[in-house]
């Protein structure tokens, strides 16, 4: 878990103390601790930054606290966090930079993937000039953090629109107010994207998850390499496999 200028020796309050089992999980670099491994906590606000200690009081790092989830803490740093919105902004920028070196031949890909980018509870996908985000934890839903997320995405990517996709069940579990999926910023919520040269229409306010299964991009291309004859794309959703197979097969049937 990286450290940077948003991390210092100053203390975030309040704190939680873990069981030996919980401390061992963190020391093995697991990013979560469950409620059954919290042995001391007191009057902690939902979504607060908390200092995390082992049973002997040793400082283990800083985490995001959930008052309702069985995943009580999600680690955000092995140091002490001074300014969560600034840290979130910096890590979004780092995630964008990292992907610029990896992503080619597509304008549709995941920019931020929660714990994988050291931003637990935040998902951001790029669909050409439309960005789609999901906020899944109390801490990421706090107004200053939300503002930092949107502002950083605007500055770094200059999108035509930013859409929030809401998972009602997750917000219920986190005891967050229910919101509709909506255009957060800009004027555009739909666009056209390309994966492996194949064009797809994208509507940020419709469909499953954040709108498409971006993790299947390489599988679409791989399937097309071996395709021939007649093909069936079952449970096809947007027809990702069917559209990739169509140029190679004599016929393709997509069924959803």
Task: Label each region the model flagged.
Residues 238-250:
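Conserved SAM-binding loop of SAM-dependent methyltransferases across substrates and taxa
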Residues 227-237:
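Conserved class I S-adenosyl-L-methionine
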Residues 30, 227-228, 249:
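Short, well-ordered alpha-helix to beta-strand connector turns
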Residues 47, 129, 219, 235:
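Residue-level signal for inorganic ion chemistry
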Residues 1-128, 188, 255:
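Non-catalytic accessory regions of SAM-dependent methyltransferases
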Residues 250-256:
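Short beta-strand element of Class I
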Residues 83-106, 132-179:
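Cysteine-centered catalytic environments shared across enzyme families
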Residues 112-125, 146-213, 221:
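Non-catalytic substrate-recognition/targeting regions of SAM-dependent transferases
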């Amino acid at each position: 878990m990286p450290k940077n200028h948003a991390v210092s020796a100053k203390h975030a309050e309040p704190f939680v103390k873990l069981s030996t089992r919980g401390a061992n999980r963190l020391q093995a670099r697991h990013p979560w601790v469950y409620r059954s491994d919290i042995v001391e906590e007191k009057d902690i606000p939902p979504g607060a930054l908390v200092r995390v200690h082992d049973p002997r009081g040793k400082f283990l790092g800083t985490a995001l606290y959930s008052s309702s989830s069985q995943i009580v803490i999600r680690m955000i740093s092995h140091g002490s966090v001074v300014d969560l919105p600034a840290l979130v902004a910096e890590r979004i920028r780092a995630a964008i930079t990292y992907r610029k070196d990896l992503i080619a031949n597509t304008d549709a890909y995941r920019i931020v993937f929660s714990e994988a980018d050291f931003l637990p509870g935040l998902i951001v996908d790029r669909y050409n000039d439309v960005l789609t985000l999901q906020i899944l934890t109390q801490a990421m839903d706090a107004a200053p953090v939300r503002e930092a997320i949107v502002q950083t995405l605007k500055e770094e990517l200059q999108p035509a629109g930013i859409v929030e996709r809401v998972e009602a069940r997750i917000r219920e579990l986190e005891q967050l107010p229910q919101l509709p999926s909506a255009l957060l910023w800009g004027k555009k919520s739909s666009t056209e994207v390309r994966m492996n040269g194949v064009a797809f229409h994208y509507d940020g306010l419709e469909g499953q998850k954040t709108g498409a299964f971006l993790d299947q991009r390489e599988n679409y291309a791989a399937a097309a390499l071996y395709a021939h004859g007649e093909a069936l794309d079952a449970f096809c959703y947007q027809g990702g496999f069917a559209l990739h197979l169509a140029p190679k097969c004599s016929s393709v049937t997509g069924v959803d």
